[in-house]
Amino acid sequence: MELAQIVERLKKNEVVAYPTEAVFGLGCNPNSKSAVEKLLILKQRPVEKGLILVAHKLDLLLPFIDESRLKQSHWQLLTQQYDCPTTWVVPAKLSVPKFITGQFDSVAVRLCTHPAVAQLCEQTGFALTSTSANLSGLPPCKTAQQVRSQFGEFFPVLDMAVGNAVNPSEIRDIFSRQIFRRG
């Protein structure tokens, strides 16, 4: 599908697939409970796990982050460019719903450099949820055709290539820098 069609689907609180730095992600409007519920059902993902949020600029992630708990050094980590995509687990605002944070009082966020994410966020005006586009037990999709093979020929997928990263993002804690998932 073309960018404009994917943007319309996102604005209608539908789940779409889009390319990220290494693999295709499944995403939706994180402010829509119904959209997130559709995503969780599609992925067969327990709500307790929480979701990653991606955007091309920090402004779109700030509504989810408890800024009062972060120091300048944390902001530097969050906004720095890395060799591999890096998702940071940061304190969530109390207003962030549990369908985003899961069982945690934190939220996982990533500034994504992929042009597709930038265009989608710019045109929708919101960050996107991001979980790898794959059915349980199958590897994450690296092409639009793989997405269609797993989710059906008519699943809304943005026809663009993934970035050059080899692995999905590394996930780290902003305070301890503990690695939850290697990139």
From Swiss-Prot:
Its EC number is 2.7.7.87. It comes from the Bacteria. Its main location: cytoplasm. GO terms for molecular function: ATP binding; double-stranded RNA binding; L-threonylcarbamoyladenylate synthase; tRNA binding. GO terms for cellular component: cytoplasm. Keywords: ATP-binding, Cytoplasm, Nucleotide-binding, Nucleotidyltransferase, Transferase, tRNA processing. PROSITE patterns: YRDC. InterPro entries: DHBP_synth_RibB-like_a/b_dom, Sua5-like_dom, TC-AMP_synthase, TC-AMP_synthase_SUA5. Transmembrane segments: none annotated. One of its GO terms (biological process) is regulation of translational fidelity. It is found in: Cytoplasm. Pfam families: Sua5_yciO_yrdC. It catalyses: L-threonine + hydrogencarbonate + ATP = L-threonylcarbamoyladenylate + diphosphate + H2O. SUPFAM superfamilies: YrdC/RibB. Residues 1-183 form the YrdC-like domain. Belongs to the SUA5 family. TsaC subfamily. Required for the formation of a threonylcarbamoyl group on adenosine at position 37 (t(6)A37) in tRNAs that read codons beginning with adenine. Catalyzes the conversion of L-threonine, HCO(3)(-)/CO(2) and ATP to give threonylcarbamoyl-AMP (TC-AMP) as the acyladenylate intermediate, with the release of diphosphate. This is Threonylcarbamoyl-AMP synthase. It comes from Mannheimia succiniciproducens (strain KCTC 0769BP / MBEL55E).
